[in-house]
Design a protein with these regions (language model features):
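Intrinsic-disorder-associated, low-complexity terminal segments enriched in Asp/Asn/His/Tyr and depleted
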Residues: 12-13, 22, 34, 45, ...
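Alpha-helix boundary/capping motif
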Residues: 13-16, 27, 37-38
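C-terminal substrate-binding subdomain of Rossmann-fold SDR/epimerase-dehydratase oxidoreductases
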Residues: 253, 274-397
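N-terminal Rossmann-like NAD(P)+-binding domain of SDR-like oxidoreductases, especially those catalyzing
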Residues: 65-252, 379, 388-391
Length: 397
C-alpha cells in the first residue's frame, strides 16, 4: 500500500493537538561480530594493491574503530519519501538510525521493510516539540533534517502550515545544535532545501550564487521557496556565528519508488495514470522544463556531503541536469509503460487557483557538488520511469 491522501484531509493531521512520543524498534542492540568482520575485511583490503597481508587483530584498535563506526543518525521526516530511502541506506551501512516523523505527508508503511530492524528507533512525534528535539539531538552523532511541508498542491492549499512547518522546527534544531556546540559537542547537520528557492530566476541553468527571484506575496506558492530560503539563511548564520558544521542541499525534482502523487508530484501521477489506462493530465502547455533524479543517486550525495568536512558551510544543488519538458515526460511514461492512455491539458487555474504561477525552466548547475564530492547522477530518465512503474506494478493485485 502506498502513502498519500488527498490534500483536504491533511488539515486533520496538521491540527493534531499534542504530538505523541511513540517509540518503536528495539533500538540499542549492536551487532558487534558484524562490525568486527567489517573492520577486519577493511584491513585486508588496505595497503598496496595486490598485496595481501595477514593481520593480527589488535583488540584496542578494533574497539576504538568500532566506536567510530557506530554512528547514530537522526532523520527528521524519515517516514517520508526521501527519508525512508535514506534510513534504509544508513541501516545497510551499519548506522544506528532514529527516525522522527509526525506522519503528516509521510507514512509508516514507507518503513515497512525496516520497521523491525534492531538498529532503528521510530518516533512518531513532531519536531516542533522542544523537549523531543532536545532528547533526539542529544542521542545523535549527525542529523539529516528533511521534515517539511512538501508538494505544490499542498503548498497552494495550506500556506500557513507551509511557513510554520518549514521555519520554526529548523530554527529549533539549529538553536539546540548551537547550545550543544557551546558545550563542546559538534553534531554535523544536513538541511534539505529546494530548487524552489531560485523562484522564477530566468537563467537557463541555476547555480548556487544566483539571485532568488520570487513572485508577489499575494501568491501563496512562493511561500514554500521563501520559507526554505529562510532555513538556508538561518543555517548559514549558525555556521558563521557559531561555527556549526552544517551543509545545505537544494533538491531538484527527486523521484523514485514510494513517492506519492497525492500532493502534486508529477511523475507518480503520470505513472499511476498510465498503468491504470487513465489520461495523463499535463498542466498548461507542457513546455515547462524539469530535471528528474532518482532517489538512490540523491541519497549517495546527501551522505557524502555530510561526511565531507570541506563541504560544510556551503549550499549545493543536488539532482539531475538532464532537462525534459513535462509533455515529453508524459509521452515517455506512456511509451515505457506500453500504455494506451491519452494526454489531456489542464490550465494552472483549474489545477490550483487563479493566483498560481509556475516556473518555466528548472535546471541545476552541478559543478559545485561535482567539485566537492565528485557527484554525477547515474540513472537516466528511462531507468527512473521503469523503477517507479515497477513499484506500482508490483503493488497492483
Ligand atoms: N522530493 C523532492 O523532489 C524534493 C524537492 C525539493 C526539496 N525536497 C525536500 O526534501 C525533504 C523531503 O521531501 P520528501 O519528498 O521526502 O517529502 P515527504 O513529504 O515524503 O517527506 C517529508 C516528511 O516530513 C514529515 N514531517 C513534516 N513535518 C513534520 C514535523 N513537524 N515533524 C515531524 N515530521 C514532519 C512528513 O510526515 C513526511 O514524512 C523536504 O524537506 C523537502 O522540502 C524534496
Amino acid at each position: 500500500m502506498r502513502c498519500g491522501r488527498q490534500v483536504s484531509p491533511l488539515r486533520d493531521h496538521f491540527q493534531k493537538s499534542s504530538p505523541s512520543l511513540n517509540g518503536r524498534g528495539n533500538g540499542r542492540i549492536l551487532k558487534l561480530p558484524d562490525l568486527t568482520k567489517r573492520f577486519t575485511a577493511g584491513l585486508r583490503n588496505s595497503g598496496s594493491p595486490g598485496v595481501r597481508r595477514r593481520l593480527r587483530p589488535d583488540p584496542f584498535r578494533i574497539s576504538h574503530l568500532m566506536a567510530c563506526l557506530m554512528t547514530t543518525s537522526l532523520i527528521t521526516g524519515g517516514s517520508g519519501f526521501i527519508g525512508s530511502h535514506l534510513a534504509e541506506h544508513l541501516l545497510r551501512r551499519g548506522d544506528d538510525v532514529i527516525v522522527v516523523d509526525d506522519l503528516s505527508t509521510g507514512c509508516q508503511n514507507n518503513l515497512s521493510g525496516i520497521m523491525e530492524h534492531p538498529r532503528l528507533d521510530f518516533i512518531e512525534g513532531s519536531i516542533d516539540d522542544v523537549a523531543l528535539v532536545a532528547e533526539l539531538l542529544g542521542r545523535s552523532d549527525r542529523v539529516f533534517h528533511l521534515a517539511a511541508a512538501v508538494g505544490v498542491a499542498l503548498i497552494a492549499k495550506e500556506p500557513i502550515q507551509t511557513i510554520e512547518r518549514n521555519v520554526y522546527p529548523t530554527q529549533l534544531i539549529l538553536d539546540r545544535l548551537g547550545s550543544m556546540a557551546q558545550r563542546g559537542r559538534q553534531v554535523p547537520c544536513f538541511i534539505a532545501s529546494t530548487s524552489e528557492v531560485y523562484g522564477k530566476n530566468p537563467k537557463d541553468t541555476w547555480s548556487e550564487e544566483d539571485d532568488l527571484v520570487f513572485g508577489a506575496t499575494t501568491r501563496p506558492r512562493w511561500s514554500y521557496g521563501v520559507s526554505k530560503a529562510i532555513d538556508e539563511f538561518l543555517a548559514l548564520a549558525y555556521v558563521k556565528q557559531q561555527g556549526l558544521p552544517i551543509v545545505v542541499g537544494r533538491f531538484f525534482n527527486v523521484v523514485g519508488p514510494r513517492q506519492t502523487g497525492a500532493y502534486g508530484m508529477v511523475l507518480p501521477r503520470f505513472v499511476e495514470a498510465a498503468l491504470a489506462g487513465r489520461p495523463l493530465v499535463v498542466h498548461d502547455d507542457g513546455h515547462q522544463v524539469r530535471c528528474f533524479a532518482h532517489v538512490d543517486d540523491i541519497i549517495q550525495a546527501v551522505v557524502k556531503l555530510i561526511e565531507t568536512p570541506a563541504a560544510s558551510g556551503r549550499v549545493y544543488n543536488i539532482g539531475s541536469d538532464q532537462p525534459v519538458s513535462i509533455l515529453d515526460l508524459a509521452k515517455r511514461v506512456i511509451e515505457r509503460t506500453n500504455s494506451s492512455s491519452e494526454i489531456q491539458f489542464q490550465s494552472y487555474s483549474d489545477a490550483y487557483d487563479q493566483s498560481f504561477e509556475d516556473i518555466r525552466r528548472r535546471v541545476p548547475d552541478l559543478q559545485r557538488i561535482h567539485d566537492a564530492i565528485g557527484f554525477r547522477p547515474t540513472m537516466n530518465l528511462n531507468d527512473i520511469i521503469d523503477s517507479v512503474a515497477n513499484q506500482y506494478a508490483s503493488e497492483t493485485p
